[in-house]
Regions:
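Nucleotide-cofactor and metal-assisted catalytic machinery
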Residues: 52-232
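Feature of multi-pass inner-membrane transport and sensor proteins
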Residues: 1-30, 36-40, 44, 48-59
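Short, flexible loop/turn elements at secondary-structure junctions
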Residues: 16-19, 35, 66-68, 232
Length: 232
């Protein structure tokens, strides 16, 4: 036991009480600092993840979509210029690509699967499967500073970045070692579904499933949408 000369017991108890009080304060402060640091770290990680998701879903500064059945098959930039909107005055680079309709529906593509769509996707089964040529896809990827994808004649790929249909597209790719589009039979080029964004719609709902085919195959297909891609 330690005795301090010149200090009475009351004073010693006061010192001990103050030390215990300060220890509790320091403990609480350290706990709060730990919680704050963790919260900031989690918040920063979440923000970075959301920013990355947003960037992947919106790879262009602008895209203008034109429904061919309504607007006709036209040059979008020329149409805008004729209406006093000259995109080239503002844009660093532009590309126009086209999306076609296959001669099959998504229900035919998903044949043999037990599918359950979200309410927003109730019209998907009866919709024609979207098709894009490999050249147009690579033009879109170049706008995003991405490397081109190689596809040989007689081959096809599937692209999808929408959670509501991704698993069905992945299963369809596995069950279709070959597929016929526009009267041309194509062999599966890869076993993995691509997850690229070639046009922008709403975040998380860019592509419910698109066939990527050689340029020659699209010649016999009906064009559905033209898209002007713009980077400022």
């Amino acid at each position: 036991m330690l005795y301090l000369k010149g200090l009475n017991m009351f004073l010693v108890r006061q010192i001990g009480s103050k030390i215990r009080t300060n220890y509790l304060v320091v403990t609480v402060v350290c706990g709060l600092l730990t919680i704050t640091i963790c919260a900031v770290s989690i918040g920063a990680s979440t923000a970075l993840a959301m920013n990355k998701m947003s960037q992947s879903a919106t790879p262009y500064d602008l895209n203008v979509l034109s429904n061919v059945s309504v607007d006709g098959d036209s040059d979008i930039a020329a149409y805008l210029a004729a209406h006093d909107i000259t995109i080239s005055n503002y844009a660093k680079v532009t590309e126009q690509i086209s999306v076609y309709e296959a001669d099959m529906t998504y229900s035919e593509l998903f044949e043999g699967q037990k599918v359950k769509f979200w309410p927003i996707d109730e019209k998907v089964p009866d919709s024609k499967v979207s098709v894009i040529s490999i050249s147009d896809l690579n033009r879109a990827l170049a706008m995003q500073n991405k490397a081109p994808i190689t596809l040989n004649d007689g081959q096809y790929l599937l692209n999808c970045n929408y959670n509501g249909t991704y698993r069905y597209i992945a299963a369809a790719l596995q069950s279709h070692p070959e597929i016929t589009v526009g009267g041309v039979t194509l062999q599966r080029a890869e076993d993995k579904v691509l997850q690229e964004t070639y046009i922008m719609t709403s975040v998380g709902n860019n592509d419910r499933g698109t066939l990527i085919v050689p340029d020659s195959v699209t010649a016999s297909l009906e064009k559905d949408v033209n898209a002007l891609l713009v980077q400022y």
